[in-house]
C-alpha cells in the first residue's frame, strides 16, 4: 500500500517512514501540508497519517482541503492533544480515526490495518474513458469490452496517464514511476513504450487518447471517471 505521512517532527517522521516501510508499505513522508498537497496531486495514495499540529496550514485544514478535492482515502490523525474536542473536530473535518501521542507503534499499525480493511471494499476498481476501461484489480485494459494485450510497463503508463487525465505529464515523471531506482535509464525508453501503447489502442477502433505536447510531455485527452 502507498501511505502518506504528514508529520513535522523529524525524528518521528523518520521513525514512521522506517517502521511502515518495514511492514511492506511504500511511504511518502513529508513535513507540512503544502508538500502533502503536492504529493497527492502527483501520486496515488491508499491512506494518510496526518499530525494536527503542523506548521503553516494546520492538519485540520489539510484534511478539509483533501476532502474538498475529492480525495477519499482513509485518514488517521496523529495528535498530542488528547481532549475530546480535538478528536471530534478531526473526525468532523473528514478523518476516519485518531491516535494520541505518545503511542506504541503496534497500536498505530493495528488502526492503520483496520482502516485499510474497511476501505478495501470502497476502492475504485475501474477507470473509464470513452470506450476504454481500465480494470485496476486485474491490471487489464479493455476497449469496447475487448482486452488489449499490454505489457506491464505499458499498463503502468496508461494507468498513470488516466489518473492524471487532461494534465500534461512529463517524461521524467513517467520515468520516476517505472524506474524509481534507476537514474541512468534513457528517457527515450518512455517514447518507445508510449508509441507501442498508442498503436495498440489505435488498433482497437482508432482510439487515440494520448497526445504529445512538444517539449513538455504527454496528455491523456479523454475525461476519465
Curated annotation (Swiss-Prot):
GO terms for cellular component: cytosol; protein-DNA complex. InterPro entries: CheY-like_superfamily (IPR011006), OmpR/PhoB-type_DNA-bd (IPR001867), Sig_transdc_resp-reg_receiver (IPR001789), WalR-like (IPR039420), WH-like_DNA-bd_sf (IPR036388). GO terms for biological process: positive regulation of phospholipid biosynthetic process; regulation of DNA-templated transcription. SUPFAM superfamilies: CheY-like. Residues 124-222 bind DNA. One of its GO terms (molecular function) is transcription cis-regulatory region binding. Keywords: DNA-binding, Phosphoprotein, Transcription, Transcription regulation, Two-component regulatory system. It comes from the Bacteria. Residues 2-116 form the Response regulatory domain. The modification 4-aspartylphosphate is found at residue 51. Disruption phenotype: Deletion leads to loss of expression of the outer-membrane protein OprH which is part of the response towards Mg(2+) starvation. Disulfide bonds: none annotated. CDD domains: REC_OmpR_EcPhoP-like, trans_reg_C. Pfam families: Response_reg, Trans_reg_C. Member of the two-component regulatory system PhoP/PhoQ that plays a role in the regulation of resistance towards polymyxin B and cationic antimicrobial peptides in response to limiting concentrations of Mg(2+). Functions as a transcriptional activator by direct binding to a cis-acting sequence upstream of the target gene promoters including oprH and pmrH promoters. This is Two-component response regulator PhoP. It comes from Pseudomonas aeruginosa (strain ATCC 15692 / DSM 22644 / CIP 104116 / JCM 14847 / LMG 12228 / 1C / PRS 101 / PAO1).
